[in-house]
Amino acid sequence: MTSAEMTSPNNNSEHQAIAKMRTMIEGFDDISHGGLPIGRSTLVSGTSGTGKTLFSIQFLYNGIIEFDEPGVFVTFEETPQDIIKNARSFGWDLAKLVDEGKLFILDASPDPEGQEVVGGFDLSALIERINYAIQKYRARRVSIDSVTSVFQQYDASSVVRRELFRLVARLKQIGATTVMTTERIEEYGPIARYGVEEFVSDNVVILRNVLEGERRRRTLEILKLRGTSHMKGEYPFTITDHGINIFPLGAMRLTQRSSNVRVSSGVVRLDEMCGGGFFKDSIILATGATGTGKTLLVSRFVENACANKERAILFAYEESRAQLLRNAYSWGMDFEEMERQNLLKIVCAYPESAGLEDHLQIIKSEINDFKPARIAIDSLSALARGVSNNAFRQFVIGVTGYAKQEEITGLFTNTSDQFMGAHSITDSHISTITDTIILLQYVEIRGEMSRAINVFKMRGSWHDKAIREFMISDKGPDIKDSFRNFERIISGSPTRITVDEKSELSRIVRGVQEKGPES
């Protein structure tokens, strides 16, 4: 099967669509609606270090490995030896492909001893060399890295532009699908440094590496794919050991199946409050101030999975593995034994150790390798530090979307800013994404500090509306009765309600009579 078979136009369609060539770059074919237009040139533009050369090499490598389509790589910057050496870090053996006649690297890099142009500048010789290589190797894919170097080597930009037009026209005449890289000065400035490169190409892809808050965030944007459709806007990506990995969040569809099967939270009373437990493929958010018992709920959640011989992964971003093991053991949970049985995996990392896209990739990789039935993230708020609201929301969408796709039950925690009193759950930008929200908070009752728990929201199920007392003992969580004689608990200012004892006794008797004798 060729790279164009699944994206070729329908012969019966009224309008002839443009066939596309799949790049097999993770996520790119989704946002480009099938890949790059066949027989056309695509300009990949970005500042230094954004991954332009990597994109151009991966485009060729995937074509050779996945579809047995030979390629030609034209380098104006690095030597072929450097390119082959750098590609090895991604597990790509370009030297072997060269020896097998599947890849040809055309060295047009500058002479280290300098060069002097005598007479008029043209690319006729280079064009003929490229043409010869394409014909000899029957190449369908061509990458040129980079156009900027041509401008830097020669001063006459108008002449260089003319020659680039000639080069692109010749490649189009041959029918090669071409990727050309160019450098830009600013992340959100002109598309290319010399302002003419984008007019030479049919398509433009922009790579960015923007500093947001305290972290850098890589994004890819398809600015244009002439004559064909594509998804608009920026999409986050990361560079892994296997190359570029784009997260096409906008391409995600709400097509996952919904299950009526319930799973236990690990706390019997909480299961009762949720109408019998969490739905199997749901995402639960436990939110509250520090110390309200969120990590304890997470621990019970993963312990229950292991007790039922199901696998679980705990992603911890606030506590070390040793601390998690110690705290769990103090509540009667032996996480080490669960790990030995290969039922539990604990992944600990500082949020600042990587960007959100890198953390998302790690989470997806761990899920793919370990195949858990449940995951827990403690906590999302730690990952939100130093990043924009949009980047954080995209991260949460990526995690929840992947968990639902794999039919995994997920319990995430979020630490609220306010120690007591009401706090807006919607400020975290994740309340609408999750299926169930458990609200934990501190309340002051009769001069003493107490904890309260409430099932704030649960999609598709009845749930208890009461605000109940939540106690933590050496045996773990213990949910008591509701604060029946108090109101305004969520606001942080509980007020005692005067209760007429006779009326209250009548209410209790009436409730018992309505319930009737147990069968």
Swiss-Prot record:
Mutation effect (Q153A): Higher CI ATPase activity, clock speeds up
Naturally occurring in which organism (per UniProt): Synechococcus elongatus (strain ATCC 33912 / PCC 7942 / FACHB-805)
Effect in UniProt of substituting G114A: Extends the period of the circadian rhythm to 27 hours
Gene that encodes it: kaiC
Residues that bind ATP 2: 290-296, 331, 451, 457-459, 461, 463, 465
Keywords recorded for this protein, A-Z: ATP-binding, Biological rhythms, Hydrolase, Kinase, Magnesium, Metal-binding, Nucleotide-binding, Phosphoprotein, Repeat, Serine/threonine-protein kinase, Transcription, Transcription regulation, Transferase
Subunit note: Homohexamer resembling 2 stacked donuts with a central pore nearly blocked on one side; hexamerization is dependent on ATP-binding. Binds 12 ATP; 6 between each subunit in both layers. KaiB only binds to phospho-Ser-431 KaiC (not doubly phosphorylated KaiC). Complex formation between KaiB and KaiC is regulated by the phosphorylation state of KaiC and by an ATP hydrolysis-driven conformation change in the CI ring of KaiC; complex formation is slow. Slow complex formation is crucial for the timing of the circadian period.
Induction of the gene: Transcribed in a circadian rhythm with maximal expression at 12 hours and minimal expression 12 hours later; expressed as a kaiB-kaiC opperon, this gene does not have its own promoter. Autorepresses expression. Negatively regulated by labA. Non-phosphorylatable kaiC mutants still down-regulate the kaiBC operon.
Sequence positions that bind Mg(2+) 2: T295, E318
Effect of P248L: In kaiC6; induces a low amplitude phenotype and decreases the interaction with KaiA
Residues that hold ATP 1 according to the record: G49, T50, G51, K52, T53, L54, S89, K224, L225, R226, T228, H230, T240, D241
Effect noted on mutating S157C: In kaiC2; extends the period of the circadian rhythm to 29 hours. Lower CI ATPase activity, clock slows down
Stated consequence of mutating G421R: In kaiC11; extends the period of the circadian rhythm to 44 hours and increases the interaction with KaiA
Residues reported in the UniProt entry to bind Mg(2+) 1: T53
Protein name per UniProt: Circadian clock oscillator protein KaiC
Thermal dependence of activity, per record: ATPase activity is stable from 25 to 35 degrees Celsius.
Organism phylogeny: Bacteria, Bacillati, Cyanobacteriota, Cyanophyceae, Synechococcales
Ranges for region Linker: 248-260
